[in-house]
């Protein structure tokens, strides 16, 4: 939802504890935080920043002692637009994103940003991205930073979404056991569906053979949709209007059950009510 650095403080001031950015590629090189048209209704689709600059700015907002530091800003999602990449480019993209984060966000392990990171990929066939990403951090001597990283494999959406068993197999191929965030959703101008897929994901998360740590839903901009998503049992909500989520969380029905996550909460641990 946030692709320009000037938008970051606006979302944080409205109550967000996390942000999502769309990362576009030139070949295998992550180049811009940019979505383009069409996008959610009411959203500025053409805001952008250079990838490295965006990461450096995120580091400022999540590094204690920095003048821009925000204690409540604890996580960001990189929506990686790898849909058009071939298998070789996907592997190289994983390498390049790892190097970009290591240098520009984690500051090569020297007092870098402390936020958790979720890497979201649009195709379960792109599991090699994750394998390469992890291997780069290990080779560079920063395997410990993988403790801060989660993964989302959620597509492709056309012609139909993959089964959850297929998603699970992709994570196994990626070498991922835990740290799994799984998303579902619709653009905010689409007619609201019955959330059947979302309910299926939540049920799988809570099952004995569940492989999912957290479930998040997008794009939730209405009070009514927020309430419905909470009733289904999501762990996170992606919105263009953070204050809407804050307002609902403060309602009598929800305030004793839900709250915004803090840095001390484990983003890879499934919440048990």
From Swiss-Prot:
Disulfide bonds join 39-45. The active site is at 35 (nucleophile). This is Dermonecrotic toxin. Belongs to the arthropod phospholipase D family. Class I subfamily. Dermonecrotic toxins cleave the phosphodiester linkage between the phosphate and headgroup of certain phospholipids (sphingolipid and lysolipid substrates), forming an alcohol (often choline) and a cyclic phosphate. This toxin acts on sphingomyelin (SM). It may also act on ceramide phosphoethanolamine (CPE), lysophosphatidylcholine (LPC) and lysophosphatidylethanolamine (LPE), but not on lysophosphatidylserine (LPS), and lysophosphatidylglycerol (LPG). It acts by transphosphatidylation, releasing exclusively cyclic phosphate products as second products. Expressed by the venom gland. GO terms for cellular component: extracellular region. Its cofactor is Mg(2+). Its EC number is 4.6.1.-. It is found in: Secreted. It catalyses: an N-(acyl)-sphingosylphosphocholine = an N-(acyl)-sphingosyl-1,3-cyclic phosphate + choline; an N-(acyl)-sphingosylphosphoethanolamine = an N-(acyl)-sphingosyl-1,3-cyclic phosphate + ethanolamine; a 1-acyl-sn-glycero-3-phosphocholine = a 1-acyl-sn-glycero-2,3-cyclic phosphate + choline; a 1-acyl-sn-glycero-3-phosphoethanolamine = a 1-acyl-sn-glycero-2,3-cyclic phosphate + ethanolamine. GO terms for molecular function: lyase activity; metal ion binding; phosphoric diester hydrolase activity; toxin activity. It is an enzyme of class 4 (lyase).
């Amino acid at each position: 939802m946030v692709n320009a650095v000037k938008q970051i403080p606006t979302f944080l001031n409205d109550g967000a504890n996390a942000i999502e950015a769309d990362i576009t590629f030139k070949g295998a090189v992550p180049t811009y935080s940019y979505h383009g048209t069409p996008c959610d209704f009411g959203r500025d689709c053409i805001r952008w920043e250079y990838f490295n600059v965006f990461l450096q700015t995120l580091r400022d907002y999540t590094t204690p002692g920095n003048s821009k530091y925000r204690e409540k800003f604890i996580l960001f999602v990189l929506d990686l637009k790898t849909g058009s990449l071939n298998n070789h480019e996907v592997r190289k993209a994983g390498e390049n994103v790892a190097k970009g984060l290591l240098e520009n966000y984690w500051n090569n392990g020297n007092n870098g940003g402390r936020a958790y990171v979720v890497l979201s990929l649009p195709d379960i066939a792109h599991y090699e991205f994750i394998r390469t990403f992890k291997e780069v951090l290990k080779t560079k001597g920063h395997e410990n930073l993988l403790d801060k990283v989660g993964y989302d494999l959620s597509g492709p959406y056309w012609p139909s979404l993959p089964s959850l068993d297929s998603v699970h197999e992709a994570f196994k191929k990626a070498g991922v056991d835990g740290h799994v965030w799984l998303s579902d959703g619709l653009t905010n101008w689409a007619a609201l569906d019955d959330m059947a897929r979302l309910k299926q994901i939540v049920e799988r998360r809570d099952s004995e053979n569940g492989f999912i740590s957290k479930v998040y839903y997008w794009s939730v901009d209405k009070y009514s949709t927020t309430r419905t998503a909470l009733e289904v049992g999501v762990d996170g909500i992606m919105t263009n209007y953070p204050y809407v989520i804050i307002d609902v969380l403060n309602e009598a029905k929800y305030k004793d059950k839900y709250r915004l996550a803090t840095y001390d909460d484990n983003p890879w641990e499934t919440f048990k009510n």
